[in-house]
């Protein structure tokens, strides 16, 4: 054990260098790597040193593009599950009675079925005790089927407790860190997504969704789900509490409550998570595949910074993405980046802008941000992300890259009005030189922000394929997002002359009175208050 902890201090990280990790990935057969584009071979070598590797035939990957289809598939997979259902989400919407009923019916129909749910404790109990919340919605499943069949866990950031928690408003508490993974597993299949489980994500909130029908990959994410669950509170019934539920710390958990001994908790959680982040179970069906079937390689990457020792953060997401972006060194390469909450990590932004590849950024227009026209402080959140987009455009201009890097705003109606949608998609796509379709994508929960790499728990996958159909489907996914995207440039932030009524003389005849000077105003959805400038400078890392 001493040697394990001494290793922490012998491998200190710096902001300027990306560390090399050791994994238990076997060396890829030369016949396999040679069948991919030559530019991808070095990427395989670099990612093999960071994250576990899975070979998944492209026929086992399905891309969904519509929230209604996502919901229908989710319900169908729950209904047909025989062994296990595991759902990791920020929260389950307090009105999702149909989804809970679907899980209940699956449990009733199959006595061998086990259900495991992981949400965030702060977000999942925000409305309690006055109103319904995720916890009050879920507790009837435990009451009816027992905690031996329904294991509901709620992760609480270890870095918020005591006076800080009691004095800070509930919604502000959530800025200290959340369980942000979105893993939806059913037997030997899993959906990776950026979507949570609430009605807007099932109807009119655009996101991304990949369905993998692969047992080994599903088992890996199930292991991640279980590990974080074993560092979380368990939701149980309570006849004494007005809410009908309580959160308790099981003795079977892998460490003590963080509020009791934070140092020990971080030590135990680091010890638990390191082998999962770096290794995979060696038992593998890949050797049964013909070389012709090996057309897609997947690297699961996760960011668990709040649970890891600060001197040895062995999270794999940030390091893998920065390695991947070092590949953008050719004008013949294309990349696409999207985030509904646009506040790009500076190191990611630097690599995207500094590379030679041409790029497209898609972000939410203010009227597609779920906080648009909301009450209180959150009213200014769309402005904050708009400011981040403006700063990005300024940096692109300063680097002389306006001809090859474009930013688009996604908008489909006005959120919270009839037929209005919001935008929550996040991801990255990259092509090889001289190809129009991407062959690499990242799917998962991360928004690629400073917050994602310091406060929240994130889980994603890097997908690299040579399959023509899967590449086409990746491009179709981009095209689907671009349908509602319009260019945003720095000129859009400039004041524009407003239409003036034709001057009328006292006698009522038009044109005889001298016209008023033109009135110049910035468009309503381009205005950014001074307070937002200050707030982003101070609190930008929480966005």
Predicted regions and their residues:
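Active-site cores of enzymes that catalyze phosphoryl transfer or operate on phosphate-rich substrates
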Residues: 28-68, 248-320
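Extended catalytic-interface subdomain
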Residues: 166-170, 193, 222-275
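PLD/PLD-like phosphodiesterase catalytic module centered on the HKD motif
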Residues: 2-79, 97-191, 195, 199-204, ...
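Acidic, glycine-rich loop-and-beta core segments that form the ion-binding/anion-interacting portion
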Residues: 299, 312, 318-334, 352-356
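A short acidic, Gly/Pro-enriched loop at the edge of an enzyme's catalytic core
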Residues: 82
């Amino acid at each position: 054990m001493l040697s394990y902890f001494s290793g922490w201090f012998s491998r200190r990280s710096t902001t300027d260098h990306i560390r090399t990790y050791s994994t238990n990935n076997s060396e890829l057969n030369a016949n396999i790597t040679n069948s991919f584009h030559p530019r991808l071979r070095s990427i395989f070598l670099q990612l093999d040193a960071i994250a576990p590797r899975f070979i998944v035939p492209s026929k086992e990957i399905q891309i969904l593009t519509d929230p209604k289809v996502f919901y229908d598939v989710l319900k169908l997979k729950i209904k047909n599950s025989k062994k296990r259902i595991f759902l990791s989400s920020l929260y389950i919407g307090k009105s999702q009675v149909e989804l809970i009923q679907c899980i209940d019916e699956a449990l009733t129909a199959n006595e061998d079925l086990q259900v495991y749910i992981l949400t965030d404790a702060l977000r999942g109990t925000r409305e309690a005790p006055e109103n319904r919340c995720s916890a009050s919605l879920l507790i009837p499943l435990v009451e009816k089927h027992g905690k031996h069949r329904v294991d509901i866990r709620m992760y609480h950031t270890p870095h918020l407790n005591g006076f800080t928690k009691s004095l800070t408003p509930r919604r502000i508490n959530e800025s200290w860190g959340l369980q942000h993974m979105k893993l939806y597993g059913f037997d030997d299949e899993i959906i990776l997504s950026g979507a949570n489980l609430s009605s807007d994500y099932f109807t009119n909130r655009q996101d991304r969704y990949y369905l993998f029908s692969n047992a080994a990959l599903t088992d890996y994410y199930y292991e991640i789900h279980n590990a974080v669950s074993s560092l979380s509170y368990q939701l149980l019934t309570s006849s004494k509490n007005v809410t009908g539920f309580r959160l308790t710390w099981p003795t079977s958990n892998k460490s003590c409550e963080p509020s009791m001994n934070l140092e020990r908790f971080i030590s135990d959680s680091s010890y638990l998570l390191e082998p999962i982040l770096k290794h995979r179970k060696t038992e593998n069906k890949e050797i049964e595949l013909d070389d012709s079937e090996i057309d897609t390689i997947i690297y699961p990457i996760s960011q668990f910074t709040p649970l890891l020792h600060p001197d040895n953060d062995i999270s794999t997401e940030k390091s893998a993405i920065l390695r991947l972006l070092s590949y953008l060194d050719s004008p013949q390469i294309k990349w696409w980046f999207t985030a509904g909450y646009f506040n790009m990590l500076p190191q990611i932004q630097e690599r995207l802008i500094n590379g030679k590849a041409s790029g497209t950024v898609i972000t939410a227009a203010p009227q597609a941000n779920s906080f648009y026209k909301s009450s209180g402080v959150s009213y200014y959140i769309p402005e904050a992300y708009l400011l981040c987009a403006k700063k990005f455009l300024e940096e692109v201009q300063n680097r002389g890259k306006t001809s090859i890097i474009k930013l688009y705003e996604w908008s489909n109606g006005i959120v919270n009005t009839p037929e209005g949608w919001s935008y929550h998609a996040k991801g990255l796509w990259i092509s090889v030189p001289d190809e129009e379709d991407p062959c690499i994508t990242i799917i998962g929960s991360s928004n690629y922000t400073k917050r994602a790499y310091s406060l929240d728990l994130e889980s994603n996958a890097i997908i690299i394929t040579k399959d023509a159909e899967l590449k086409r489907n990746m491009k179709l996914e981009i095209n689907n997002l671009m349908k509602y995207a319009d260019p945003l440039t720095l000129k859009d932030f400039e004041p524009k002359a407003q239409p003036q009524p034709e001057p009328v003389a006292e006698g009522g005849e038009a044109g005889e009175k001298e016209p008023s000077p033109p009135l110049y105003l910035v468009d309503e959805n381009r205005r950014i208050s001074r307070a937002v400038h200050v707030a982003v400078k101070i609190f930008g890392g929480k966005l």
